[in-house]
Amino acid sequence: RTQLLLSAPNGGTPEQLYYGSRTSDADIRSICETARGRNAYPVYGMGYPCETALSVRHADGNLTLQMAVIGVKETRLTEENATLTVIELKDKVYPFFVNICYKAWQDADVIETWTEIRHEEKKPVQLQQFASAYLPVRRGNVWLAHLSGAWANEGQLCQEALQPGMKVIKNTDGVRNSQSAHAEVMFSLDGKPQENTGRVIGAALCYSGNYKLRIDTQEDDWHHFLAGINEENSWYNLKKEEVFRTPAL
């Protein structure tokens, strides 16, 4: 079983503290007291040095975002045997809102995540980047497995060690979004993948259109994984009170 620990102080930045095997209550307390968290949904505009999940152009032309927690809601979905946790964010200057949603399936050991974006600005806000999710993966001997190919040769397994720089898996073919690549990856945390041993993290984007998966490895201690709709030539003008929901990862 896996476990995701989040910190969402009112007025502060939402952070991911831990993702991995289930821990004891004592370990959870220790992690919450000592862990240095990573921004749960990094946005563009306030000095964040790595790849961002969200960037926008406000109605007045400004590109800056600075999101803060305004609430947390948790709902038990009995019929689905799942728990839905929603971290509500608001920009510190603009009436711009983001909900980070986590749906934990208790019987499948799967955590589904997506975002819901809306605003109350006077004119439309242009969404220029809108990833579904962000996951930091601790650097080490981490390998990436993904599928590639071409016509009549689809689904070829590619395995590679993650190196400094950017790794991008994307599609711009529309309805043919699984011919040359797939929106699914698997991270092997203990070196080159083995059939019967080792820790892995799997991720699949539930989207039938153009997608982009990014892995940004810089000078810090993390591989920064982001996945969502491919925003190239696809900026979206979000109307006031309209809700833009990203596909689930």
Language-model segments: residues:
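Polysaccharide-binding surfaces and accessory modules of carbohydrate-active proteins
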Residues: 2-216, 222-223, 232-235
